[in-house]
Amino acid sequence: MGNSATRRKPPFDPVADFTPITGAVYFSYFLYVPANFPAKTMKEFMAYAKANPGKINFATASMQTRITAADVVKKNGLDVSFVQYKGESAASTDLLADRIQAMFSSTTQMPLVKEGKLRVLGTTLPARNPQFPDVPTLAESGIAGGEFGAGWLAFFGPAGMPRPALDRLNKALLGALENPEVQSRIKAAGLVYTPIRSPEAMAKFVREESDTYRKIAVELNLMQD
């Protein structure tokens, strides 16, 4: 969604070019820092960033995390240097080596937190991730911005899908997603089963998500050709 929202001439229209079938899962983003970083909380991170303008290299590995990070930085008046990576693997390597000092990412970095190699300070979205209840939200820590920052996965079909086929697929996919074994795997991966389960609700969500990301991308001057 972030990639199409930041393109002046996107290669596809996420609203018009597909038929939403159902949501699947969503995941919040977490702010990770090296294990030796001076801050241990979000408030300490903000205080350090404000006391050391220009010293934090902030990695982003997708347009979604770039928009989330830029929103937090702008709304809290921080001065950081953004470093764009093509993928999380390279960004994670540099974060471990302290070549960068902060990164928003999904739960994929949590094993490194458990090993004591990284530290997690906070998470986006209004509510805590149920799989990591000890990690406070940015809002709880009094940090502005980033509340929309989340990744999600859903099922889509081609535009103009016949309603009978759409209904059959929706029923079949929800049945598979609600299988106890699948639910167990979703939780084990740190994901959350989506509450967006009807084609209509998913279509509404996609429209709103596209509008939100495009509006913020324009405000943050992140639009690309």
Locations of regions flagged by a protein language model:
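A ligand-binding cleft/hinge motif common to bilobed small-molecule-binding domains
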Residues: 1-9, 66-75, 102-135
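An extracytoplasmic/periplasmic, membrane-proximal ligand-sensing/linker region
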Residues: 76, 114, 163-225
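Alpha-to-beta junction loops
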Residues: 52-56, 78, 96-103, 117-119, ...
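Short acidic active-site motifs
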Residues: 90-91, 108-109, 201
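Conserved functional loop/turn residues at catalytic and ligand-binding sites
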Residues: 41, 99, 117, 142, ...
